[in-house]
Amino acid sequence: MSTSLWLNNLEEWMNEDYIRAIFENVRKVNYYEDGESGAILKTCCIEFESQDAARNALERQSTQRLISGNPISLDVVPEWQKPSYYMLFISNIDPEVSENDIKYLFQRYNFISARVLRCVDGTSTSIAFIWLANESDIQNAQVEMQGAFCLKRSILVHSVKSDKNTYLSSPGFYGTPQPLNQFTDPNNTAVYVHQLPENITTQELRSYFLHFGEILYTQVNNNSGRIVFAQRYFAEQAINEMNNFPLHGVRIQLSWARPPSMALLPSKQSTYWPALAAPVYPSMKDVPNNPFTPFSPINPYYAKSWNHTASAPLLPPGLKNGSDYPYLSVPPDILNDSYLAMCEAVNSRLDAESTMLLPVHYSQA
């Protein structure tokens, strides 16, 4: 590690004396100015007397605040050098995660820098960016660190690079979604338990996890088990707290499992109507396959028609046929009869009101 660190949120009133007051063992402070305007940049280089002093300042930055209340942003590289490295976007991080926690998690991938996005008051937004040296490290980190735990939450790793042609070539400008797995699926609530004792039963395993939340399904088979919770938050808590938990003298290991088939879950009579088909624009030939888009194109004619489905939809409880279901397609004969009856009624009314209209003169009393 170098003995120099970069302060990337330098404020106008911060002079060298103030920087020496908030950091220990400072040897030199270098300021930089714009070559054209002559204005001092919001980045300065701080040289410490030793590598240990620089490392201590970097580790303590998450607990320090400036007079204005903003958190200190120390980094090993300046802001203008970061575009030359490869970047990843991380979401769903714990509010207490700092840059040092992310560094320890990704340091085996040629880690360069990390930044946690914070609000004005210094609270975390649960979003962070990391910079790595090589493109291969980016690809490996995106696959291997997907769903990894950092403090109390499993993080989601996203690639920042995007191909413009990918979005323009897709129907309706919808990008091709990334495939979901058991780590990234936001609806996955299944937990896999490894290294279970041989004499443990399904009910006993269920009793150890009931305090985390509602459990839909539990199974024990060949020293392993599967637990399906009602919500993902319950599963995250269980993995975080019960991993390496000693059970009958054996430490169990927990990880995400593949979502089970709906046939395994207990069936319940539902009184809800079937969901409508996904609406699309008339210019689109297919239903958008991106489930994360905030946009919802509306086409009421397509939404009320089930002709595009391969099989008839499920009917609500109590209906023996689809005649009373408002979203099933109406037979053409009924539509034709309704149209002819409406035309006949309009013509009859026009004939009845086709008498000559005479002007009416009101006499003034």
Curated annotation (Swiss-Prot):
SUPFAM superfamilies named among the record's database cross-references: RNA-binding domain, RBD
Residue pairs linked by disulfide bridges in the UniProt entry: none
Biological processes, Gene Ontology terms: mRNA 5'-splice site recognition; mRNA splice site recognition
Leader peptide range in chain numbering: none
Annotated TM spans: none
Annotated ranges, domain RRM: 3-79, 86-162, 189-259
Observed effect of gene inactivation: Leads to lethality.
One Gene Ontology term of the molecular function aspect: mRNA binding
Keyword RNA-binding attached: yes
Domain of life: Eukaryota
Gene for this chain: usp109
PANTHER family listed in its UniProt record: TRNA SELENOCYSTEINE 1-ASSOCIATED PROTEIN 1-RELATED, TRNA SELENOCYSTEINE 1-ASSOCIATED PROTEIN 1-RELATED-RELATED
Keywords of this entry: Nucleus, Repeat, RNA-binding
Protein name in UniProt: U1 snRNP-associated protein usp109
GO-annotated cellular components: cytosol; nucleus; U1 snRNP
Subcellular localization(s) per the UniProt record: Nucleus
UniProt keyword RNA-binding, yes or no: yes
